[in-house]
């Protein structure tokens, strides 16, 4: 049984009535998501943020208990040995998800510095960033770079939901995912001199802009096709490399 479903039912409240997460609360969320007692396959906060962002943008609402199960890689509640930290972690995640929804619902022309969506990203260790880039035998870049795990979380959410298929095959919609793909791969195979590193922020505006454009694409699609339309086409935003666990070395 998915324990997150029961938790959501017991804590069914309007999370958007809370103020946006403060800097201190965001730091607390980072700390809680880094708890070593979480499952090895649980997502990092970066990856979880990307996953939640894709769920908030996507074709139809993803039930909360399902994306929580995906984030923690288990159907049972995290941190069972510490109920207070468990509740705090889940509450902060719910508020972050509400913040994401609120930010992306504002038209780009009306956004301010305070309302603009910004992805969460952990600080990288300089030694983990290998430049110029090197590839492993599977053709994947080795090491870390800016927003790597955020983009991987977004990719996982898209790959898990067949309803993304209309966008993936649309000649105008699919290119909107280009910044996400670039952040996921860390370099451009067609332009090897361009690569992401720990300090580069040059593509961040393009990434954020693409998220608003994706949100608008799906809004228009729902208006034209309805909110709930089944799709059977297999999504193509999938890499063959396995998911990296929170305690696994970087590929």
What are the functions of these language-model segments?
Residues 1-151, 155-251:
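Domain-length accessory/inserted modules outside core catalytic folds
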């Amino acid at each position: 049984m998915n324990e997150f479903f029961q938790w959501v039912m017991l804590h069914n409240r309007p999370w958007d009535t809370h103020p946006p997460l403060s800097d201190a609360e965001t730091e607390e969320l980072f700390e809680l998501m880094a708890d070593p007692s979480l499952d090895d396959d649980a997502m990092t906060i970066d990856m979880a943020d990307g996953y939640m962002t894709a769920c908030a943008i996507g074709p139809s609402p993803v039930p909360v208990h399902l994306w929580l199960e995906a984030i923690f890689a288990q159907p049972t509640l995290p941190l069972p040995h510490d109920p207070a930290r468990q509740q705090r972690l889940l509450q902060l995640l719910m508020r972050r998800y509400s913040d994401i929804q609120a930010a992306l619902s504002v038209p780009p022309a009306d956004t301010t510095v305070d309302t603009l969506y910004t992805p969460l990203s952990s600080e990288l260790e300089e030694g983990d960033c290998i430049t110029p880039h090197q590839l492993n035998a599977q053709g994947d870049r080795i090491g870390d770079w800016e927003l790597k795990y955020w983009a991987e979380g977004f990719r996982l959410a898209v790959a898990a939901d067949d309803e993304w298929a209309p966008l993936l095959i649309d000649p105008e919609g699919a290119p909107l995912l280009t910044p996400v793909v670039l952040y996921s791969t860390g370099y451009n195979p067609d332009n090897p001199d361009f690569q992401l590193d720990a300090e580069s922020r040059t593509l961040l505006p393009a990434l954020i802009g693409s998220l608003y454009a994706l949100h608008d694409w799906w809004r228009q699609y729902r208006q034209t096709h309805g909110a709930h339309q089944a799709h059977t086409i297999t999504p193509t935003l999938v890499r063959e490399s396995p998911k990296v666990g929170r305690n696994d070395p970087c590929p």
